[in-house]
């Protein structure tokens, strides 16, 4: 309702910046989606949505709500089908909507679909999970892509970042996140020198300092975060092993 009041024309475009449940589930509750409201998404997101709810972590989203006692909301989300985007892009798309321009760019990093939206006239970037106060989950990540995406953000003439999670911020948060990603890769490079197996490497205590989770979201969420963190470190292992040969 708040967004509707920003323009007499109401909502005209909805842009999904990822396929994860916290970026797609809300589209089920937008009046006129697919009709008055044009649904835009990266092709990667469209492909994942076609696979069904659990493919893009809707289950995690719903079960976290149940664990916190929000059963009515969880049931409503379970029943609501996520609509299919109508307009998709591989890498970039530009919306010319005078007086503003919306430059949409698939960045990758957090997931293959993760995209950002730059509004040059306002000096604003909607970064999705490329920038996140929580550091960002790595379950579907490629850290090399992520670091390059953050370097691109650092180069932009922007005053304001609307991150995927957390309060509106400046480029300092992007810089801190880049430093974190570089540190994770560097730690993996050092641990690999020990000659450990993949399982031993992933379990190495050196990585625990990078784990973050909002414990206020309940035990289910915490366990899911631990599991996705482990999967993320496995991905970093594969990525760094491939880099060093």
Role assignments for model-derived ranges:
Residues 3, 18, 30, 39, ...:
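Divalent metal-coordination and catalytic microenvironments
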Residues 94, 101-190:
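Metallo-beta-lactamase
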Residues 87, 91-93:
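Non-catalytic beta-strand/loop surface segments
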């Amino acid at each position: 309702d708040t967004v509707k009041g920003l323009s007499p024309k109401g909502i005209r475009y909805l842009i999904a910046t990822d396929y994860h449940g916290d970026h797609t589930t809300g589209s089920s509750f937008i009046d006129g989606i697919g009709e008055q409201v044009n649904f835009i998404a990266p092709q990667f997101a469209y492909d994942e949505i076609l696979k069904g709810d659990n493919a893009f972590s809707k289950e995690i989203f719903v079960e976290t709500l149940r664990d916190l006692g929000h059963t009515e909301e969880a049931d409503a989300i379970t029943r609501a089908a996520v609509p299919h985007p109508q307009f998709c892009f591989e890498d970039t798309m530009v919306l010319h909507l005078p007086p503003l321009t919306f430059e949409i760019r698939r960045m990758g990093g957090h997931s293959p679909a993760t995209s950002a939206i730059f509004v040059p006239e306002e000096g604003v970037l909607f970064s999705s999970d490329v920038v996140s106060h929580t550091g960002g989950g790595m379950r579907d990540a490629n850290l090399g892509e992520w670091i390059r995406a953050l370097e691109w953000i650092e180069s932009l003439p922007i005053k304001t970042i609307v991150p995927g999670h957390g309060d509106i911020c400046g480029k300092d948060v992007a810089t801190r996140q880049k430093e974190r990603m570089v540190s994770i890769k560097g730690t993996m490079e050092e641990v690999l020198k020990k000659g450990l197996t993949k399982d031993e490497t992933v379990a190495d205590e050196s990585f625990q300092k990078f784990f973050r989770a909002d414990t206020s979201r309940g035990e289910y969420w915490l366990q899911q975060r631990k599991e996705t963190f482990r999967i993320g470190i496995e991905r970093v292992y594969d990525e760094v092993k491939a880099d060093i040969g």
